[in-house]
Amino acid sequence: MKKISLPKIGIRPVIDGRRMGVRESLEEQTMNMAKATAALITEKIRHACGAQVECVIADTCIAGMAESAACEEKFSSQNVGVTITVTPCWCYGSETIDMDPMRPKAIWGFNGTERPGAVYLAAALAAHSQKGIPAFSIYGHDVQDADDTSIPADVEEKLLRFARAGLAVASMKGKSYLSVGGVSMGIAGSIVDHNFFESWLGMKVQAVDMTELRRRIDQKIYDEAELEMALAWADKNFCYGEDQNASQYKRNEAQNRAVLKESLLMAMCIRDMMQGNKTLADKGLVEESLGYNAIAAGFQGQRHWTDQYPNGDTAEALLNSSFDWNGVREPFVVATENDSLNGVAMLFGHQLTGTAQIFADVRTYWSPEAVERITGQALSGLAEHGIIHLINSGSAALDGACKQRDSEGKPTMKPHWEISQQEADACLAATEWCPAIHEYFRGGGYSSRFLTEGGVPFTMTRVNIIKGLGPVLQIAEGWSVELPKAMHDQLDARTNSTWPTTWFAPRLTGKGPFTDVYSVMANWGANHGVLTIGHVGADFITLAAMLRIPVCMHNVEEAKIYRPSAWAAHGMDIEGQDYRACQNYGPLYKR
């Protein structure tokens, strides 16, 4: 089957159409703006899969309806999913704009005095607003000379932020969320909302019963040679942690081997269900070989599966990581307990950064007073105002141990195309695999246990659905925290020490939900959250605006907030603008 091509970014150079000297004097400058924009994006941004982003430039500068239509015809044939219009001069507003209502679009009007690029920018944005097709405005802070071909830093930041978010929108469109199972333990996020995926994300939902996973395992609908490779890899790389089960629940060596084998098979089969596997076609299993075109998935697990079969912890942890027995590769997005809304937050983070995501319970707020009472030690540094214990039963990406290193040698989680095999091995070495606690998981399994290194910048996010309002996004930028070992051990043991832990300290603003750490915990909208590497809340805000998802909670600096220009017409309070604009325009793919 032919592979689906990746979305491209279309660059639209628009120009003053008056001949006999005006257009002719601007052709080279205008087209050079387009080429410079394309070069910047190609150099600085990759798709989440690691592929280089392709830009498609209109064949000619666009002065009016005819050339605009020719450009659109070219873009339609090239899978252009995002457009950036550029100009150094006055052009004819509504005659030259991109009118596709579902394609993210921005306009860069050159800030120069020789020709009024800013005037076109304002006129074109007015047309977009009047027609109900929001666009992003890009206008440099400082005046440039007409022959200055450089892209100022503030313009570059907006171009790249727009491009990252726009590509995320285009990449999700037409894909599916694979729901393996149904509602897990009454968790609302696993009540998968088809309308949300269809209307806001342009995606479909593929619902598959967990018996399909059982069938694939029992009937050997997988690559048997790959299973042997996976087992050998696990034998070489897995370090096993303590078995905290009572003696009557401990498994013998043969039983543990069977649990490991099934856990690895679950990873293989869920992956094959998501993206397909041509090896299955070679076995005559053509239908199963196709997969479900899933860009994200969720596995119910508890309790209808886990009461009798190994849990999903190992499978989910490995799929969510940037490496496995096949080496370093793009991480998958697989939500524990089929929490589709947390899965969407994971999907957003992965599409924006190319990195693995940490799925976690937002488990406990530890006040400085409570920590000192329990441990006899005081919190300090980033943790001085309190911490949030982010922990789940072992399904977080192993990258979350933060044994990868950035250019300055600091702990981080890299885009998968930058990860070395040595860094992948270091993450594995920092992970223990602990037998699942019988009281939770009667069918057994292995939970990954690691501790995230401290001082690493993270952005915690979550999507929630509010009846009568629709989806909303929560964002909390902060840092991982390293606690003294004795303190960590004592606090960790009060929850479950066989699971992975990140101690998180959000950045406080002294206002609203970020008045203090307790307020962050108290205002979080669900029991789960996602950690994405870096302080990238501004990118999430831009993406949410494109999809018409209002942001109900964030601690991003106001100067970094970048939304379509029409948002400014929806009131003077910046967050109220977001709600009113999202309500006014409705979901991007409204049905």
Curated annotation (Swiss-Prot):
This is L-fucose isomerase. It is found in: Cytoplasm. One of its GO terms (biological process) is L-fucose catabolic process. The keyword Ribonucleoprotein does not apply. The keyword Metal-binding applies. GO terms for cellular component: cytoplasm. Mn(2+) binds at E337, D361, H528. NCBIfam families: fucI, PRK10991.1. Its main location: cytoplasm. Pathway: Carbohydrate degradation; L-fucose degradation; L-lactaldehyde and glycerone phosphate from L-fucose: step 1/3. It catalyses: L-fucose = L-fuculose. Keywords: Carbohydrate metabolism, Cytoplasm, Fucose metabolism, Isomerase, Manganese, Metal-binding. It comes from the Bacteria. Its EC number is 5.3.1.25. Belongs to the L-fucose isomerase family. Homohexamer. It comes from Salmonella choleraesuis (strain SC-B67). Its cofactor is Mn(2+). The active site is at E337 (proton acceptor), D361 (proton acceptor). Converts the aldose L-fucose into the corresponding ketose L-fuculose. GO terms for molecular function: arabinose isomerase activity; L-fucose isomerase activity; manganese ion binding. HAMAP family: Fucose_iso. PANTHER family: L-FUCOSE ISOMERASE.
